Amino acid sequence: MSIFEVRQQSNGAVLWTGSAFDEVSALDAMAREAGYIDFQALPEEIRAAHPVARPIV
């Protein structure tokens, strides 16, 4: 596992930081921590902001 940071692409705001296996699982982990089942369950306006997960080196 690696440490990932999820940022809102439009303004660079950090939405989540934590460990995950890859970018997809980082987005899912962010959504679960916010109380959703996975990334696809997030409201459309959040997904439309195009959150981006990147590993922290």
Which residues does each predicted region cover?
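Short aromatic-glycine-(Arg/Gly/Cys) micro-motifs in beta-strand/loop hairpins
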Residues: 1-13
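Intrinsic disorder/low-complexity segments enriched in polar/small residues
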Residues: 6-9, 24, 46
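A short, exposed loop/beta-hairpin motif centered on an aromatic-Gly-Thr core
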Residues: 12-21, 32-34
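Alpha-helix capping and helix-coil boundary motifs
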Residues: 22-25, 38
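Short amphipathic, charge-patterned alpha-helical segments
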Residues: 26-30
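Short, mixed-charge low-complexity intrinsically disordered segments
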Residues: 32-57
